[in-house]
Amino acid sequence: MEYLNLQRLDEISEQSFQTCQPYPWANIEQSLTPEGYELLRQTMPAVEGFDKHVGVKRAYGQAPHDRYLLHYRPGVEVAQPWQEFIAELQGPVYQNFLRRVLGNHTFIPTFEWYYAWEGCAVSPHCDAARKLATHIFYFNTEDDWSSAWGGQILILDSERKFKVHSGPTFDQLKVAASIEPRGNGSLLFQRTHHSWHGVRPLQCPQGKLRKLFLITVNIPSFQVWWRKVRGKDPDGYRLKAAPTGSRTEGVRYPCSASCLPICAYIPGSVGCHVPSPST
């Protein structure tokens, strides 16, 4: 079974991607094979296995990004189609696609599922410097998600008025594009110092979930290196999932003194994903 629609990926040229404004992005329709998309959609992970993030403080005055989140690591149990898809994403074909449109870098991909409920939003932000790009796959359809409920991914134009480490509101930014995250499609965008993006609060009925699968295209950085030394992946998670029910699973702990200068978290609020040696 092939999951990536290689013909569609081949149609994305480096020039068209890199010259897109206000920063490099592409909405890729039919980015998965029809059979692969349907198989993945039918075997999405159950929300009961996710961590629920509510009110997690962000830097620079940005509003929290509430959501259910499942971070993939060896040991995380997902359906066979998802194991096959992730293996394909780690293989040479997808890696070559990324190098063609993003440049000849060393990529360290990480994978997450995001589910969001009524009222959840993604406040405007630029991603961390270790994230060269993000590739978001949509897993709602017209049958289970109405466009009237929102959820559109907004490509925002700051007109270079705001520093990357700031917290502008939606009203202070222009909407360059509004991406409907439904059906077999995906959004690839490159991180820059002005790659602002966000999602306004969802207005869906209770019980409905907006479902996405994200690939974070990390590149080697001091932060990534330091986390690897400490047995973590680029996102700060242990390289292997903790056994179900263990103390570390789904819990964040305050940073230790040694990692406060390194971690990208706010001291005393979010902290690391795993206990420091002192806890």
Region roles according to the model:
Residues 1-21, 165, 229-255, 259:
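Fe(II)/2-oxoglutarate
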Residues 26-28, 186-189, 271:
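Short hydrophobic-aromatic micro-motifs
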Residues 78-79, 87, 95-228:
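Catalytic core of non-heme Fe(II) oxygenases with the double-stranded beta-helix
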Residues 4-5, 14-97:
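Non-heme Fe(II)/2-oxoglutarate
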Residues 248-279:
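N-terminal low-complexity segments that are often proline-rich with Ser/Thr-Pro
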Residues 50-51, 134, 236:
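A short, polar/proline- and glycine-enriched secondary-structure boundary/capping micro-motif
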